[in-house]
Amino acid sequence: MRSRALFAGIGVLLAVFAADVLAAAEVRGVRLWRAPDNTRLVFDLSGPVQHSVFTLAAPNRIVIDISGAQLATKLEQLSLSNTPITSVRSAQRSPTELRVVIDVSAAVVPKSFSLAPNQQYGNRLVVDLFDQEAAANEASTPQVAVAPSTPQPPVSPTQPATNKLPPVPGGNRDIIIAIDAGHGGEDPGALGPKGQHEKDVTLAIAKELQRQINQEKGFRAELVRTGDYFIPLRKRTEIARKKGADLFVSIHADAAPSRSAFGASVFALSDRGATSETARWLADNENRSDLIGGVGSVSLDDKDRMLAGVLLDLSMTASLSSSLNVGQKVLTNISRVTPLHKRRVEQAGFMVLKSPDIPSILVETGFISNHNESQKLASAGHQQALARSIQGGIKQFFQQNPPPGTYIASQRDQGKIAAGPREHLVTSGESLALIAQRYQVSLAALRSANGLKNDNIKVGQTLDIPATALAAQP
C-alpha cells in the first residue's frame, strides 16, 4: 500500500512538473540594435512572462531573470560589434525559470518593459542598456511640458527656435535642417511586395537629402536617425530641437489598405483633424510606431491622448503657417519627379509634427505597398531625384524667409539673393495685425499688397507679404 501511495505521489509531482513545462513561454528569438546612446535587446516570446533585471559589478554584468520561460533559440548568433556587450549567456535555473546574463565592457543603466502583441509582433521583452553618460544627461534634463496650461507668445516663422547653436562670428550661421528617417530598428515600418522595409528606404533617402543640402552654402543638414535603431516619436523632435533645427523634415514611404494607392504627399500638422481619409489612416498608422517599437508603458491606443499630444495654441500658428508654406514648395518640386497622391499639402495629427517652435513637414515619398512605386523607391536614381526635389523646395522657402543671423539672411540683405515674393497661408486664430507684426511690415502695406479694404481675412486665404520695412502703423 505504501509503495502504491508513493508511486501515486510521484506521478502527481511529475504531472505538475510536466504541466509547468508545457505552460512555459518560449524565447523564440533575440534581436539587438545599437543606437548612439544605448543598446536594445528584444526577446521575442510565445506568451507573456514576468521578469526582473539587476546589475552586478566586478565584472560588469546585467542579469535578466524571466519567470515562466524557456530558451528556444541560440544566443551565440547575436552580432555584438559596436556595442558594450562582450557576451550573452543563459542558464535554465528550473524548467520555467530562465536567467540571461549579459557581460558588458563598461557600466550601463538598464531599463526594461514588456510589450503586448500587435499586428507585426507577438509578446516581447525589451531591455535597453543606456550608456552611463547618456543616462546621466537624461536624468539631469528637465522634462518638456506636453501641453502648457497658458498660451505662449507667438513664435516668428523666421525667428530661430530656442536652444539654437550660438551664431558664428558676423551672424552668418547655417540654416539647420533636421532630417528624420521614419521608423527604424524594432519598427520596420511598412513592407513592400518584395519584402522591402520602409525604414531602409527612408534612411537611404534621408542620407541622400543630407548630402545634397550640405552642398549648399549656408545650409547644414542633421540626421535624426543615423542607423538602424528605434527612436520614440517625441524623442525625434527633441533631437531636432537640440540640434538647433530651423526646419524638421520627416521622410516616409508608407503603405495603404489598397495596394493600388500611389503617389507622393506632403503633410503638415492639422489643428482640426485629417483633411482626408487617407491622411487620417496614415497618421494613425505612423503614430502607432511607439507601440511597435516600444516606449515602456506609453500607449498610443488611446486616440484622445494621441490626437491631443501637444495642443495647438497661439505659439504654433506661426510654425504651422511656415510648415504649410515650405510644404507646398516641396510638393510642387516633387510633382516634377513623381506622381502626386494629392496636389495640396494635407494635414493630419502626426505625432512628429507636433512641435510648437519648429516648422515641420512629413514627406510621404510614395506607397511602398504599390508594386511599381516600391521598385522606384528602392532605386538609387529615384532616391536622388526625390532628395533633389525636397532640397529645392526647402531652399526656395528659406531664400524667401531666412532666419535672422543666418548666412542666407545676410546674402539677401546685401542684395545677393533675390528676396522674391513671400506668401502666408492664414490659419485659425490669426489676425491681419498679428501677421503684419510677424513679418515686420505695416498694416497699410499688407492691406495694399493684397487689395484689402479692411482687416478681415479668412482661414485658408493666401496673403502676399510685401518687402516693405516696418512703418508706423495707422
Where are these regions (language model features)?
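Signal-peptide-cleaved, periplasmic/extracellular N-terminal interaction regions immediately downstream
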Residues: 20-177, 431-437, 442, 474
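Bacterial N-terminal signal peptides
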Residues: 8-20
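Soluble periplasmic/extracytoplasmic beta-strand elements of cell-envelope proteins
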Residues: 33, 40-44, 52-54, 61-67, ...
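Intrinsically disordered, low-complexity glycine/proline-rich and charged
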Residues: 103-141, 372, 381-402, 458-459, ...
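Stable alpha-helical elements in mature extracytoplasmic
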Residues: 126, 198-201, 205, 209, ...
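Catalytic-core regions of hydrolytic enzymes
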Residues: 144-301, 316-328, 415-417, 434, ...
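Active-site-adjacent mobile loop/cap segments within catalytic or ligand-binding domains
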Residues: 247, 308-409, 447
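Primarily a LysM-type cell-wall glycan-binding module
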Residues: 414-443, 461-462
